[in-house]
Regions:
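Terminal amphipathic alpha-helical/low-complexity segments used for targeting or macromolecular assembly
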Residues: 1-4, 8-10, 51, 65-70, ...
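Flexible, glycine/small-residue-enriched loop-and-beta-strand segment within the central core
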Residues: 15-28, 33-101, 136-137, 142
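Short-chain dehydrogenase/reductase
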Residues: 33, 90, 108, 124-126
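Glycine-centered loop/turn positions within well-structured domains
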Residues: 46, 121-123, 131
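Short beta-to-alpha loop/turn elements within the nucleotide-binding domains of ABC transporters
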Residues: 101, 112-113, 119, 128
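Conserved catalytic segment of ABC-fold P-loop ATPases
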Residues: 104-107, 120-122
Length: 167
């Protein structure tokens, strides 16, 4: 029997990938896009906001082995920590996210990054471990939200109702 993730609307998946722990442990917002080769272990809970675009070879874990457990190198217990990816996030190719991380609204995660700590809203991060390189322009970001302009799963512009509750 195939399990399905809880998806709020349009979802495009470009090639094979795997979600472990679906359907109850993962929620995916509208207008989401996954590149091929993704692996998401959602047993600790994963939330992916609307308008998130995630490139190829994405790896996300919300569980880890208990290396402080009753066996070496680890026992059979899993430590679960939810991963939250906010709305309007762009994640580049070959990014890895560890358990317990929150990626803030509008953030950009550069190709090959290993995200080990929370990412602030509108931050552009990169590296191993990922660090803040700069921030998106808040005024520009808020204008696009007010105008309801979003990139669709095909890369084309998608117009949605604008929001006036920003800025």
């Amino acid at each position: 029997m195939r399990k399905r993730a809880d998806c709020a609307g349009t979802l495009q998946v470009n090639g094979p990938g795997q979600i472990v722990g679906a359907p109850l442990a993962i929620r995916i917002g509208d207008n989401a896009h996954f590149g091929s080769g993704f692996y998401i272990d959602a047993r600790g809970g994963v939330e992916i906001g609307e308008n998130c675009h995630i490139s190829r070879n994405f790896v996300c874990y919300s569980v880890n082995h208990d290396y402080e457990g009753e066996a070496l190198p680890y026992d059979d217990q899993l430590v679960q920590k939810q991963v939250v990816i906010g709305i309007n996030v762009w994640i580049g190719m070959s990014v890895c996210i560890v358990p317990g991380v929150t990626i803030g609204e509008g953030a950009v995660v550069g190709m090959g990054s290993v995200v080990t700590k929370d990412v602030p809203p509108l931050a552009v991060v990169g590296g191993n471990p990922a660090r803040v390189l700069k921030f998106r322009t808040k005024e520009h970001y808020e204008r696009l939200i007010r105008e309801g302009k979003y990139g669709g799963v095909s890369g084309r512009l998608v117009l949605k109702p604008g929001r006036n509750d920003v800025g």
